[in-house]
Amino acid sequence: MEKVSFEQFKEGYLDAIGQDSDEVIRSIYDALKLPKTCDKRIGWIRFYAPRAITLKPGETAKIPTGIRAKMEENWVLQCYPRSGLGFKFRLQLNNTVGIIDSDYYNSDNEGHIFAKITNDTKEGKTVEIPAGTGFMQGIFMEYGITVDDDVEEVRNGGFGSTTK
């Protein structure tokens, strides 16, 4: 796991969050924490919020993590909301499970991982995630393909790139 370049983070940040000064964006970028496990006995890595996030019931946020993941072929990174946030607030990833393929690392956006989350509470609760705290967890999984899978195409991109 590593950071994307500052230029890529800034582009993703402005698209997801909106206008902020270069100084603010630089300070957020410099403070990014690389995902890591919180215990050597577990397989999950924790992604940290680059800035404070507050979501009222029904609100959604697109989060530029500033992170990219390099992995071997036949591996995938699966991303989920942190269990406690899902349990307490029904915080959900909008695509249910985030799937990051190994080829995404070399995409035009440097493989910048984004998360789109929604506070789907049925109890009127507001979710507050302070900057630098975990909001999403991921696990690397190996996968197989069928013996007769003869795809030769090479794609570039994330969402929707497999249907082109």
What are these model-predicted stretches?
Residues 1-164:
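DUTPase catalytic domain/fold
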